[in-house]
From Swiss-Prot:
InterPro entries: Shisa (IPR026910), Shisa_N (IPR053891). The keyword Protease does not apply. It holds the Pfam family Shisa_N. The lineage of its organism: Eukaryota, Metazoa, Chordata, Craniata, Vertebrata. This is Protein shisa-4. GO terms for cellular component: membrane.
Amino acid sequence: MPPAGLRRAAPLTAIALLVLGAPLVLAGEDCLWYLDRNGSWHPGFNCEFFTFCCGTCYHRYCCRDLTLLITERQQKHCLAFSPKTIAGIASAVILFVAVVATTICCFLCSCCYLYRRRQQLQSPFEGQEIPMTGIPVQPVYPYPQDPKAGPAPPQPGFIYPPSGPAPQYPLYPAGPPVYNPAAPPPYMPPQPSYPGA
């Protein structure tokens, strides 16, 4: 059994080691990167042995004064988003959602130009139907070929070569179009929309 004096001295020694050893454990702590009040970025740096990272969220330096110490946990808390950063991120997200919603609406709303364009591209053969009765069709004449030139060389993409020169017939100028004065006009003239016209 140890003497009574040593039993009383042991707790005092442990407390003294804790009080004196705490600065040694905390010494050499690093200062993490930070942004100053102007928004300028400052890289992190190491403090020498027996010095601590001191200062505020916006200004850091190495010192030996424990009252000015800023712990690593406090430094990391300073890195949390500021109100300006949160407002910037929120406005960017809102702007992105607005652009996406506008684009979707323009492709789905019938009053929008992009919707009409998309409908025209999907159905190119649909549209206003114009009756073709009463309009004479002129015959199509082949382009005259020079008999001295010989057959034309085959064009790329065509499988069958030409079968030789086309037979030559006397070319006559096209006559006047067939016109029937008794036929009704190809359209109906509009009726006046007000009486007495």
